[in-house]
Amino acid sequence: MRVALAQMLILDPKIMLMDEPFSALDIQTRQLMENELLQLWEADKKSVLFITHDLEEAISLSDRVIVLAAGPGTHPIGEFIIDLPRPRDVAEIRMTPRFLQLHEQIWSAMKEEVLKGYQQTKNKLVV
């Protein structure tokens, strides 16, 4: 993962697209890489489009979270400003009252879509 990140940074893109970059990592390595990404962002302040299914990761790394609807005809169903202070440490920020408040707020908006997606998958397996 570090090599892929370094290769992307060599190209000096204006926008970094990161689609589930840490999903295959164990939780400890994931948190180290998330903190490394935050440090890189602090240095250059480049725009990052980060795609993840991990709500905690989205809140920890973002300034804004956009929740999409489940299914092939996806569309935004919610937008949330993440007003957590920077610099951030992902392990520490997740224990703060504001983080927990944001988590609850976003989860409330997306819970129905998660259940809908789960039901769609479940129905495909039964048929």
Question: Where do the language-model regions lie?
Answer:
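ABC ATPase nucleotide-binding domain signature region
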Residues: 1-3, 30
